[in-house]
Amino acid sequence: RGGRIVPRFNFITLLACVFSSMAIANDCVSYKMTPKITISVPTWTKEVVQPLDEMDLWHGNVIATMVDNYDIVADITSIEDGFCVGIKQVDAEIGYSNFLVQVDIRHKPNTCSYDAVLAHEDQHIREYLSVIDDFQVGLHNALYSAADSVMPIFVYNSSDIDMAIEEINNKIQSHPEMVIIKQKIKADEEIRNKRIDKNDNGDMLKKCFI
Protein backbone atom coordinates (compact mmCIF):
# COMPACT_ATOMS: atom_id res chain seq x y z
CA ARG A 1 0.00 0.00 0.00
CA GLY A 2 2.84 2.35 0.79
CA GLY A 3 3.87 2.34 -2.87
CA ARG A 4 0.77 4.31 -3.78
CA ILE A 5 1.99 7.39 -1.94
CA VAL A 6 4.40 8.29 -4.77
CA PRO A 7 1.85 8.60 -7.62
CA ARG A 8 -0.41 10.58 -5.29
CA PHE A 9 2.45 12.95 -4.58
CA ASN A 10 3.19 13.23 -8.30
CA PHE A 11 -0.45 13.96 -9.00
CA ILE A 12 -0.50 16.73 -6.41
CA THR A 13 2.71 18.14 -7.84
CA LEU A 14 1.25 18.00 -11.35
CA LEU A 15 -1.88 19.83 -10.20
CA ALA A 16 0.25 22.49 -8.58
CA CYS A 17 2.15 23.01 -11.85
CA VAL A 18 -1.08 23.19 -13.85
CA PHE A 19 -2.66 25.72 -11.53
CA SER A 20 0.57 27.73 -11.53
CA SER A 21 0.59 27.83 -15.35
CA MET A 22 -3.08 28.79 -15.40
CA ALA A 23 -2.42 31.61 -12.96
CA ILE A 24 0.43 32.91 -15.12
CA ALA A 25 -1.71 32.67 -18.26
CA ASN A 26 -4.51 34.55 -16.52
CA ASP A 27 -2.04 37.34 -15.80
CA CYS A 28 -1.95 37.96 -19.57
CA VAL A 29 -5.68 38.74 -19.77
CA SER A 30 -5.10 42.21 -18.34
CA TYR A 31 -2.83 43.00 -21.31
CA LYS A 32 -5.55 42.41 -23.92
CA MET A 33 -5.92 45.31 -26.34
CA THR A 34 -8.75 46.40 -28.63
CA PRO A 35 -7.45 45.26 -32.02
CA LYS A 36 -7.21 47.66 -34.94
CA ILE A 37 -8.38 46.17 -38.22
CA THR A 38 -7.35 47.15 -41.75
CA ILE A 39 -8.44 45.33 -44.90
CA SER A 40 -7.01 45.94 -48.36
CA VAL A 41 -7.65 44.29 -51.70
CA PRO A 42 -4.76 43.09 -53.87
CA THR A 43 -3.89 44.61 -57.21
CA TRP A 44 -5.25 42.17 -59.74
CA THR A 45 -4.07 41.03 -63.14
CA LYS A 46 -5.73 39.24 -66.05
CA GLU A 47 -4.10 36.66 -68.27
CA VAL A 48 -5.72 35.20 -71.39
CA VAL A 49 -4.67 31.76 -72.60
CA GLN A 50 -5.87 29.32 -75.23
CA PRO A 51 -5.42 25.68 -74.20
CA LEU A 52 -4.25 23.34 -76.96
CA ASP A 53 -7.22 21.05 -76.36
CA GLU A 54 -10.49 22.35 -77.74
CA MET A 55 -12.99 23.74 -75.23
CA ASP A 56 -16.65 24.64 -75.55
CA LEU A 57 -16.73 26.90 -78.61
CA TRP A 58 -19.46 29.08 -77.08
CA HIS A 59 -18.07 29.54 -73.60
CA GLY A 60 -14.76 30.56 -72.09
CA ASN A 61 -13.65 29.96 -68.53
CA VAL A 62 -12.30 32.12 -65.71
CA ILE A 63 -10.03 30.75 -62.98
CA ALA A 64 -9.91 33.26 -60.12
CA THR A 65 -7.02 33.26 -57.63
CA MET A 66 -8.11 34.32 -54.16
CA VAL A 67 -5.74 36.04 -51.73
CA ASP A 68 -6.53 35.59 -48.04
CA ASN A 69 -3.59 36.86 -45.97
CA TYR A 70 -3.45 38.10 -42.38
CA ASP A 71 -0.50 39.99 -40.92
CA ILE A 72 -0.65 40.05 -37.13
CA VAL A 73 0.96 43.03 -35.40
CA ALA A 74 1.57 41.56 -31.96
CA ASP A 75 1.64 43.31 -28.61
CA ILE A 76 4.39 41.59 -26.61
CA THR A 77 4.66 42.27 -22.89
CA SER A 78 7.45 40.88 -20.71
CA ILE A 79 6.23 39.61 -17.35
CA GLU A 80 8.01 37.88 -14.47
CA ASP A 81 8.13 34.34 -15.89
CA GLY A 82 7.80 34.92 -19.61
CA PHE A 83 5.87 36.93 -22.19
CA CYS A 84 2.26 37.79 -22.99
CA VAL A 85 1.58 37.79 -26.73
CA GLY A 86 -1.58 39.60 -27.79
CA ILE A 87 -3.05 41.34 -30.82
CA LYS A 88 -2.40 45.01 -31.46
CA GLN A 89 -3.47 45.12 -35.10
CA VAL A 90 -4.52 42.83 -37.95
CA ASP A 91 -3.67 43.91 -41.49
CA ALA A 92 -5.59 41.69 -43.88
CA GLU A 93 -5.43 41.42 -47.65
CA ILE A 94 -8.53 39.74 -49.02
CA GLY A 95 -9.59 39.59 -52.64
CA TYR A 96 -8.58 38.37 -56.08
CA SER A 97 -5.05 38.77 -57.36
CA ASN A 98 -5.30 37.06 -60.75
CA PHE A 99 -7.88 36.00 -63.32
CA LEU A 100 -6.84 33.36 -65.82
CA VAL A 101 -9.20 33.52 -68.79
CA GLN A 102 -9.34 30.48 -71.05
CA VAL A 103 -10.63 30.88 -74.60
CA ASP A 104 -11.17 28.07 -77.11
CA ILE A 105 -8.24 27.78 -79.51
CA ARG A 106 -10.59 27.95 -82.51
CA HIS A 107 -11.22 31.65 -81.77
CA LYS A 108 -8.36 33.56 -83.35
CA PRO A 109 -7.06 36.55 -81.33
CA ASN A 110 -8.49 39.96 -82.25
CA THR A 111 -11.39 38.45 -84.15
CA CYS A 112 -15.09 39.05 -83.58
CA SER A 113 -15.69 35.70 -81.86
CA TYR A 114 -12.56 35.96 -79.71
CA ASP A 115 -13.55 39.42 -78.50
CA ALA A 116 -17.13 38.28 -77.86
CA VAL A 117 -15.97 35.45 -75.60
CA LEU A 118 -13.61 37.81 -73.75
CA ALA A 119 -16.40 40.35 -73.25
CA HIS A 120 -18.53 37.67 -71.60
CA GLU A 121 -15.72 36.50 -69.32
CA ASP A 122 -14.98 40.11 -68.38
CA GLN A 123 -18.50 40.27 -66.98
CA HIS A 124 -17.62 37.39 -64.65
CA ILE A 125 -14.44 39.16 -63.55
CA ARG A 126 -16.38 42.32 -62.74
CA GLU A 127 -18.77 40.29 -60.60
CA TYR A 128 -15.93 38.64 -58.69
CA LEU A 129 -14.53 42.09 -57.91
CA SER A 130 -17.89 43.59 -56.99
CA VAL A 131 -18.65 40.78 -54.53
CA ILE A 132 -15.49 41.57 -52.57
CA ASP A 133 -16.37 45.28 -52.61
CA ASP A 134 -19.91 44.59 -51.40
CA PHE A 135 -18.67 42.46 -48.49
CA GLN A 136 -16.09 44.94 -47.16
CA VAL A 137 -18.18 45.95 -44.14
CA GLY A 138 -19.09 42.35 -43.38
CA LEU A 139 -15.46 41.26 -43.66
CA HIS A 140 -14.31 44.07 -41.37
CA ASN A 141 -16.93 43.25 -38.73
CA ALA A 142 -16.21 39.52 -38.87
CA LEU A 143 -12.46 40.05 -38.64
CA TYR A 144 -12.85 42.44 -35.71
CA SER A 145 -15.05 39.95 -33.84
CA ALA A 146 -12.57 37.16 -34.51
CA ALA A 147 -9.53 39.18 -33.43
CA ASP A 148 -11.27 40.60 -30.37
CA SER A 149 -12.19 37.11 -29.18
CA VAL A 150 -8.56 35.95 -28.99
CA MET A 151 -6.97 36.36 -25.56
CA PRO A 152 -3.24 37.05 -25.15
CA ILE A 153 -1.14 33.89 -25.07
CA PHE A 154 1.53 33.26 -22.43
CA VAL A 155 4.91 31.83 -23.46
CA TYR A 156 7.92 31.16 -21.27
CA ASN A 157 10.58 31.86 -23.89
CA SER A 158 11.02 34.56 -26.52
CA SER A 159 11.73 31.80 -29.05
CA ASP A 160 8.08 30.73 -28.71
CA ILE A 161 6.62 34.13 -29.61
CA ASP A 162 6.41 33.40 -33.34
CA MET A 163 4.58 30.16 -32.58
CA ALA A 164 2.11 32.08 -30.42
CA ILE A 165 1.48 34.58 -33.24
CA GLU A 166 0.85 31.68 -35.62
CA GLU A 167 -1.63 30.22 -33.13
CA ILE A 168 -3.39 33.59 -32.94
CA ASN A 169 -3.57 33.72 -36.74
CA ASN A 170 -5.11 30.23 -36.86
CA LYS A 171 -7.68 31.15 -34.22
CA ILE A 172 -8.72 34.21 -36.19
CA GLN A 173 -9.12 32.35 -39.48
CA SER A 174 -11.05 29.48 -37.89
CA HIS A 175 -13.40 31.77 -35.96
CA PRO A 176 -17.06 31.01 -36.84
CA GLU A 177 -17.76 34.54 -38.09
CA MET A 178 -14.81 34.39 -40.50
CA VAL A 179 -15.87 30.97 -41.76
CA ILE A 180 -19.46 32.14 -42.30
CA ILE A 181 -18.57 35.39 -44.11
CA LYS A 182 -16.32 33.48 -46.54
CA GLN A 183 -19.11 30.98 -47.19
CA LYS A 184 -21.46 33.88 -47.94
CA ILE A 185 -18.94 35.38 -50.37
CA LYS A 186 -18.61 32.09 -52.25
CA ALA A 187 -22.37 31.64 -52.37
CA ASP A 188 -22.91 35.17 -53.71
CA GLU A 189 -20.22 34.65 -56.36
CA GLU A 190 -21.95 31.49 -57.54
CA ILE A 191 -25.33 33.22 -57.74
CA ARG A 192 -23.96 36.17 -59.72
CA ASN A 193 -21.98 34.00 -62.13
CA LYS A 194 -25.00 31.81 -62.84
CA ARG A 195 -27.09 34.93 -63.44
CA ILE A 196 -24.60 36.20 -66.02
CA ASP A 197 -24.70 32.92 -67.92
CA LYS A 198 -28.50 32.74 -67.70
CA ASN A 199 -28.95 36.26 -69.06
CA ASP A 200 -26.51 35.77 -71.94
CA ASN A 201 -28.29 34.27 -74.95
CA GLY A 202 -25.10 34.24 -77.00
CA ASP A 203 -26.36 36.75 -79.56
CA MET A 204 -23.08 38.69 -79.61
CA LEU A 205 -21.12 35.56 -80.45
CA LYS A 206 -23.70 34.28 -82.94
CA LYS A 207 -23.43 37.50 -84.95
CA CYS A 208 -19.76 36.71 -85.53
CA PHE A 209 -20.69 33.64 -87.56
CA ILE A 210 -23.31 35.26 -89.77
Enumerate the predicted regions with their spans:
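Metalloprotease/metallohydrolase-associated module, dominated by Zn2+-dependent proteases
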Residues: V29-I94, N98-I105, A146-I210
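Sec-dependent signal peptide recognition
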Residues: P7-L14
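Catalytic Zn2+-binding segment of zinc metalloproteases
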Residues: D122-L139
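Short alpha-helix carrying the canonical HExxH Zn2+-binding catalytic motif
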Residues: N110-Q123
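Short, Lys/Arg-enriched N-terminal segments with co-localized hydrophobic residues
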Residues: R1-V6
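N-terminal signal peptide c-region/cleavage motif recognized by signal peptidases
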Residues: S20-S21
